A protein has these predicted regions:
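Asp-based, Mg2+/Mn2+-dependent phosphohydrolase catalytic module
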Residues: 1-8, 16-19, 39-40, 108, ...
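Short beta-strand/loop segments at the ligand-binding rim of alpha/beta enzyme cores
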Residues: 120
């Protein structure tokens, strides 16, 4: 059965898995500081963020997400730092400075084909960035494409593979789960998570681009129907059969 909607993961699927420059990204808001009474340096600021985030990652586990606005607000108030810009803009500046978003090969053509075929699209991403930040990033990467909705775990508490975040996407779609496909690059999180929520999984496994999840992906874990594609052209071929 052909899908009425295809949902996508973001990092490693629609966009290449980024290489983050944490210190450069975290210190990118320093030109916008209006008050820094403790004379916190860029290095101190970045190191504190890394240590705090590592602690939070342990506390939250694998299935609950932190929102970047809350995290950044804590850090700024901890150091009594004030900015000349709102927290939303500070988030975007950090996001842009951490890494450059680059679409995976042929993603734009694939999305155009889906639009032409009347197949709706959406994004479900494990991300501490706000949904607004991801929407902004997608607008830059795919200016001619309109997603029905974009869901980040930061806005909806739960992280893939927890079923709740997939259920939210299904509710937003207004469709039955069997009419939706989910494309992702991580078997444990995307493929198994989607299957458990009743969606049809598509493993995006492009070995021509760097992806930190390649080494974790073991297809022997998959004992259910799914599509395994090495590029977006293969997805188009499947849809045109």
């Amino acid at each position: 059965m052909k899908p009425e909607m295809i949902l996508f993961d973001f990092g490693g699927t629609l966009a290449c898995d980024p290489i983050y420059n944490m210190e450069e990204g975290n210190s990118a808001i320093f030109p916008y500081i209006t008050e820094n009474p403790h004379n916190v340096t860029k290095e101190q600021f970045s190191n504190f963020i890394k240590e705090l985030f590592d602690e939070i990652r342990v506390l939250r586990g694998e299935f609950i997400e932190l929102h970047e606005h809350i995290f950044l607000r804590y850090v700024l108030e901890y150091f009594d730092i004030k900015l000349s810009i709102p927290i939303e803009e500070a988030e975007w500046i950090i996001c842009k400075s951490l890494a450059e978003n680059v679409m995976t090969p042929g993603a734009d053509k694939m999305l155009k084909t889906l639009t032409e075929k009347g197949i709706r699209t959406g994004i479900v991403s494990n991300l501490c960035w706000s949904g607004a930040a991801l929407e902004r990033a997608m607008g830059e990467l795919f200016p001619e494409h309109k997603f029905d909705f974009i869901i980040t775990s930061s806005e909806y508490i739960f992280r893939k593979p927890d079923r709740h975040i997939f259920d939210m996407a299904i509710r937003k779609s207004g469709l039955k789960p069997e009419k939706i496909w989910f494309c992702g690059n991580f078997i444990e999180v995307d493929i198994i998570g989607a299957k458990n929520a009743g969606l049809f999984p598509v493993l995006y496994d492009n070995r021509d681009i760097p992806d930190r999840f390649h080494k974790y992906n073991d297809t022997s874990k998959i004992d259910f129907p799914y599509h395994h594609i090495g590029g977006w052209g293969e997805l188009i071929e499947i849809l045109e059969k």
